[in-house]
């Protein structure tokens, strides 16, 4: 073999080894510039996307599931979410590198998975898969934003409802309408740097409000020895749905990773994802445990309404309403990030004389109004939260990531892993997907039952 042929073969082998990459040894990507954020701000933004209205319904979720069943399930759900988020980012980074893209959002990632697949059916229907993923994420984000409106409305009614007439349902609609104006204002900003600043300010309000709630909660007589360890199937499934919703940052994973100045910091051992998951799991477990053991069967659908309305405690509602107001723009950012470019291209081609700023703001106003209508149609936190969490939440956390990972690395695993290692990975992913399918089927059934029961009862 000549020296030139030897060099060519060395380059070919090196290229093959690089292409067969299951994500364990990604080449250090170049630093990004422009509208980017640091790892610290990424942790704050991702934590804020999880620390939201759903957290304060966790004590109520523990009541539905039972004390010790809920305690165990909290760690199981956290672990499943962490696993799904980790393999999602790993596969996304791999495909972004493979397709010479700096980053991929969830929908285009799903399309790339199918485009590079060995399965002809997936290659021929890659756009359909992308649309399905996008619609799922759209429903998830809109559900989260409608929950934020409900949370604000619920706390406003808790503060001033005694001075208003009408039923609680009418009061909730009135307060949702009042909050709509302020939510529209916070959704007029487009850059991740501004959105992450909102997340920072929102986190301050959240920490203050959560600290006051925890301080009041731990002062209550502890009832842990009197509470049931488990309840029933329906209650447990509803608890799982509400806990899945509490980890509502699944759809923010890729948008934040895409804006990180150093992408390698996201999956590092003490990087953005692991740090965020540890913080969130510890806080959510503590809030659920102490909230339920402190108030017992009297715990409300959101623990903020168990706190007194006078003195320092009355400010808790205000702080948490402000954090939900600012946090709403974080959740809606995903919708704008995924759909606006396509909308602007098609809308601009059909209506070229409409100013770009008008189409931009009109697009944002439209989706905010959709979340408002969702909140008005189902103005009950205890129904909306598990409904969103157990459907779109389970799809985004438990079904899409393992499915896409297997398709992405299927060929690479054959060349890099032993048969036993490959079968172990496939088995783990299939188990996670089976859990997700079961959660969706059981969750939809229990939530439909809860909706029928709720609306068949007279409104107080």
Swiss-Prot record:
Pfam families reported for this sequence: Aa_trans (PF01490)
UniProt keyword DNA damage, yes or no: no
Subcellular location: Membrane; Cytoplasmic granule
Gene Ontology MF term list: L-amino acid transmembrane transporter activity
Coiled-coil regions listed in the entry: none
Superkingdom of origin: Eukaryota
Signal peptide: none
Annotated InterPro entries: AA_transpt_TM
Primary localisation category: membrane
Entry keyword Transmembrane helix: yes
Tissue: Expressed in the head, tail, body and ventral nerve cord neurons, muscles of the vulva, and intestine.
UniProtKB keywords: Amino-acid transport, Membrane, Transmembrane, Transmembrane helix, Transport
Lipid bilayer topology: Multi-pass membrane protein
TM ranges: 64-84, 132-152, 172-192, 194-214, 236-256, 270-290, 316-336, 362-382, 383-403, 426-446
GO CC entries: vacuolar membrane
GO annotation, biological process: amino acid transmembrane transport
Family stated for the protein in its record: Belongs to the amino acid/polyamine transporter 2 family.
Function: Plays a role in the accumulation of vital dyes and endogenous fluorescent compounds in lysosome related organelles. Has an effect on lysosome related organelle (LRO) function, in a pathway with serotonin.
Name of the molecule in the record: Probable amino acid transporter skat-1
Organismal lineage: Eukaryota, Metazoa, Ecdysozoa, Nematoda, Chromadorea
């Amino acid at each position: 073999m000549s020296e030139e042929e030897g060099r060519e073969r060395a380059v070919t082998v090196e290229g093959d080894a690089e292409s067969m990459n299951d994500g364990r040894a990604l080449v250090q990507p170049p630093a990004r510039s422009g509208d980017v954020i640091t790892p610290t701000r990424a942790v704050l933004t991702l934590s804020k996307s999880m620390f939201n209205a759903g957290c304060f319904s966790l004590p109520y979720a523990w009541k539905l599931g039972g004390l010790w069943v809920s305690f165990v399930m909290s760690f199981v759900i956290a672990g499943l979410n962490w696993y799904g988020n980790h393999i999602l980012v790993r596969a996304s980074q791999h495909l972004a590198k493979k397709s010479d893209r700096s980053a991929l959002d969830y929908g285009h990632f799903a399309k790339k998975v199918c485009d590079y697949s060995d399965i002809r059916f997936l290659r021929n229907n890659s756009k359909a898969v992308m649309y399905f993923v996008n619609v799922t994420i759209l429903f998830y984000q809109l559900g989260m934003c409608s929950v934020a409106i409900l949370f604000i409305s619920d706390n406003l009614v808790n503060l001033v409802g005694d001075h208003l007439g009408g039923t609680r349902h009418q009061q909730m609609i009135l307060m949702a309408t009042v909050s709509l104006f302020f939510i529209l204002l916070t959704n007029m900003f487009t850059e991740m740097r501004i959105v992450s600043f909102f997340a920072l300010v929102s986190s301050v309000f959240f920490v203050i409000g959560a600290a006051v709630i925890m301080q009041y909660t731990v002062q209550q007589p502890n009832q842990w020895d009197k509470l049931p360890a488990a309840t029933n199937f329906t209650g447990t499934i509803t608890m799982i749905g509400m806990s899945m919703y509490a980890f509502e940052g699944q759809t923010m994973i890729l948008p934040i990773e895409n804006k990180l100045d150093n992408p390698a910091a996201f999956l590092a051992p003490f990087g953005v994802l692991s740090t965020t998951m540890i913080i969130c799991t510890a806080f959510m477990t503590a809030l659920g445990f102490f909230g339920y053991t402190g108030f017992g069967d009297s715990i409300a659908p959101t623990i903020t309404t168990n706190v007194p309305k006078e003195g320092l405690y009355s400010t808790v509602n205000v702080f948490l309403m402000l954090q939900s107001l600012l946090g709403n723009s974080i959740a809606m950012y995903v919708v704008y990030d995924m759909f606006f470019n396509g909308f602007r291209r098609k809308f601009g081609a059909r209506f070229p004389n409409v100013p770009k700023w008008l189409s931009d703001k009109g697009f944002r106003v439209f989706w905010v109004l959709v979340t408002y209508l969702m909140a008005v149609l189902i103005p009950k936190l205890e129904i909306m939260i598990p409904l969103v969490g157990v459907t779109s939440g389970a799809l985004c956390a438990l079904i899409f990531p393992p499915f896409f990972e297997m398709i992405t690395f299927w060929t690479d695993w054959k060349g890099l892993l032993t048969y036993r290692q490959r079968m172990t990975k496939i088995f783990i992913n299939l188990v996670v997907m089976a859990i997700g399918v079961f959660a969706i089927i059981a969750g939809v059934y229990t939530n439909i039952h809860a909706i029928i029961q709720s609306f068949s009862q007279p409104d107080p």
